Design a protein with these regions (language model features):
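Beta-propeller fold recognition
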Residues: 1-232
Length: 232
């Protein structure tokens, strides 16, 4: 069945007549150019005014990561525009990032993301990692798993993205920090590249893992550090 499980279900647990009523099924875009049957195995990240300071909207902004390597944002708020007077609607969703996943490179996102808001910057960061959880011991030099962090530059607003642009550039908007032990290559702080080049790569970071390593559980953000469980 094409697109098995590639949907976000909005369920009403407070409906007294029909408890657990499905209010909406939001189909997630299935990239036909990829050789992966898409699915959403992880728990969504849900941002509400109850859990986050400074939020003015009612409802929630929701984020999911999927098998195809996409990071998707959903508008479940009462906002009616994107801050630039462009109209938005309830249940709108847009792809923020594509990490170029394939069967060959094994970049499956089995596990949920963790998220946090910078104390000073107020930026929302989402953290995820990849690895075929059903074949943890499988080794192949073609495997190219990663762990990464991505910054939603529009938060706390919802802005529709050009998905053709997102799919085309993939991780090019993020900084490769694989061999960086000092932080010099991190987004917004790197001084190895020009200001123009830095601006093009300031939406996130990623670390390439050796072919023998896979992320085996969801990451954990604590006190400004992100911890990734790695199977080797």
């Amino acid at each position: 069945n094409d697109g098995v499980g590639s949907a976000l279900f909005v369920i009403n647990l407070e409906d007294k007549v029909t408890p657990g009523k499905v209010e909406k099924v939001i189909e997630v875009r299935d990239d036909k150019s990829l050789d992966i049957t898409n699915s959403l195995p992880g728990t969504p990240v849900v941002i509400t005014a109850d859990t986050t300071r400074g939020i003015k909207f009612k409802g929630a902004l929701v984020y999911t990561n999927d098998f195809e390597g996409k990071l998707t944002k959903y508008n479940l708020t009462n906002m009616d525009n994107d801050g630039a007077r462009n109209p938005i609607n309830l249940y709108d969703h847009t792809t923020l990032l594509s990490i170029d996943a394939s069967k060959e490179n094994g970049r499956y996102q089995y596990h949920s993301m963790d998220a946090g808001i910078g104390k000073d910057s107020q930026d929302l960061w989402l953290f995820s990692g990849t690895g075929d959880y059903e074949r943890l011991t499988f080794r192949d030099n073609k495997l190219k798993n990663i762990m990464y962090g991505f910054r939603d530059v529009d938060f706390p607003l919802y802005v529709k993205k050009n998905e053709a642009y997102t799919t085309l550039f993939k991780l090019e908007r993020c900084s490769d920090t694989t061999n960086d032990s000092t932080g010099v290559d991190c987004p917004l702080t790197t001084n190895k590249v020009s200001l123009i080049a830095r601006a093009k790569k300031n939406q996130g970071w990623y670390i390439n893992l050796p072919a023998s390593q896979k992320i085996s559980a969801e990451p954990t953000l604590s006190n400004g550090l992100v911890y990734y469980p790695i199977f080797e």
